[in-house]
């Protein structure tokens, strides 16, 4: 993938993630929120469950944003498209599908297996 195209796609991804994170933070109560007395225990359980789901989505969005920022840094360092583990070129089709990919398919599979 051409670096100018990659940069544009990564910047668009970063901007979209920033918007999503902002929305999630606006709907996600902080740790001190909701400390009043719930109307009943079912309401409290429902609220906690929704809060847990929102927190999980927020963590995933932040993690994905970190990956996008790392890819932008690799662009600046002229190492974009090289696997961070083995150093081989990441196939163009993979970068088209995942512009933020840091690893080739083989190394990503090994990484995922190690971090389960």
Question: Could you tell me what each predicted segment is?
Answer:
Residues 1-77, 97, 115-116:
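Interaction interfaces in information-processing and related assembly proteins
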Residues 81-84, 102:
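Cys/His-enriched microdomains
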Residues 85-86, 106:
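Short, cysteine/histidine-rich loop/knuckle motifs that typically chelate Zn2+
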Residues 91, 112:
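Short functional micro-motifs and their immediate structural scaffolds
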Residues 100-110:
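Cysteine-rich micro-motifs
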